[in-house]
Each structure stands twice: as structure tokens, then as C-alpha cells.
């Protein structure tokens, strides 16, 4: 049965994730389709969801206003896989601070019991690339692109740490929920998107 994978298109790196998912599905020869989604009705029809990088405050506020945040919570809590990238990972958190301004009052989905710091590696001009390994999910020597990237300082015991960089947690997993500080859609390496496609297909079966 075909799986529908959505990319939350309220704001952020939508087109890049579309390209990465389409290429991943083709390489894997999986029966899946990619959809750009905004409304609660569109999201409710998905089997998996990518929350892209962008401005986490904007995505959170607009998803709250249009009602999509409620549907996302319901779907994820019922088992739908979700991949939160950079700002998307911020939204997955229960608590977020900013390296410069401190405590934020932004709307969060509150899926993961983690302490997260936005812009943990610096602002736009401090963007960089670094090698990360996520050996527990079969991904090693991955070139991570970090742009105003968040990092996690602590997690609850039920969260698997997939990768660290300079002792900061930059990738996590809890069941059907995955978060990365870095932008997998900005590299030619499809490993993260392929892993997510397979997770969606396995969950749907």
C-alpha cells in the first residue's frame, strides 16, 4: 500500500525536502508519494511528516493559528513518524531557550522531554559543515550542514541520542519521532531521508 509523506509547508526549506524525499523514494524503489501540506485536512491524510528548517517561532505560531498543530499532535501521538529538521526539531521539544535572548515563549509541540538551545552554534555567519555519525541507525560519516543550528543539552531516559558534536546532542530518536540539528536536505547524501522513508513504510504496514 502506498505511503503518503507530507512536508509541512507553513514556512522553511520545503522544496529541498521535496527533492530529497522524491530521490530517496526512487532510489529505494518504495511505493510512496510526497505531498506539500499546510492545512489540518491535508496533514490528517499523511502517513509521515517532515517539519523543515526555517523559523521555528513562525512555524509554531502559524500552525497554532490554522489548527494544524492539533492535528500533528494527534497523528504523531497515534504513531505517525515525524522528522523535525533544525527549526522542526525545536518544535518537537518540551522546552527551548535561545543562546542570546534566553527563555522563549514560542509555541512548541511538546513531543520530547528535552532541554534545547536555539542558535547553539551561533548565528547565520557561524554556519558550518561537520562530520556526524548515527551508527545506531546505520548512518556513518554523514556530512551535516549546520545553519543557526539548535543543540540539546539533556534528554529524558526514553530518548535515544543518535549523534553528538562537540559534546552537544545534534540528533535524537524516540520511537516514531526523529530530530536533527543539521539540514539533511542541503546535502547530496540521502541517508537520513531514506531512513525516514523506510520508517514511514514500516509503520504503515
Curated annotation (Swiss-Prot):
List the GO cellular component terms: cytosol; glutaminase complex
User: In which residues is L-glutamine bound?
Assistant: 54-56, 118, 147-148
Q: Name one GO molecular function term.
A: glutaminase activity
Pathway connected to this protein:
Cofactor biosynthesis; pyridoxal 5'-phosphate biosynthesis
* Alphabetical UniProt keywords: Glutamine amidotransferase, Hydrolase, Lyase, Pyridoxal phosphate
Q: What Enzyme Commission number(s) does the record list for this chain? A: 4.3.3.6, 3.5.1.2
Keyword check for Signal, yes or no.
no
PROSITE patterns attached to this UniProt entry? PDXT_SNO_1, PDXT_SNO_2
Signal peptide (UniProt feature, chain positions): none
Q: Could you tell me which Pfam families the record lists for this protein?
A: SNO
Keyword flag Lyase: yes
Protein role: Catalyzes the hydrolysis of glutamine to glutamate and ammonia as part of the biosynthesis of pyridoxal 5'-phosphate. The resulting ammonia molecule is channeled to the active site of PdxS.
Q: Summarize subunit and interaction data from the UniProt record for this chain.
A: In the presence of PdxS, forms a dodecamer of heterodimers. Only shows activity in the heterodimer.
PANTHER family attached here? PYRIDOXAL 5'-PHOSPHATE SYNTHASE SUBUNIT SNO (PTHR31559), PYRIDOXAL 5'-PHOSPHATE SYNTHASE SUBUNIT SNO1-RELATED (PTHR31559:SF0)
* Protein name per UniProt: Pyridoxal 5'-phosphate synthase subunit PdxT
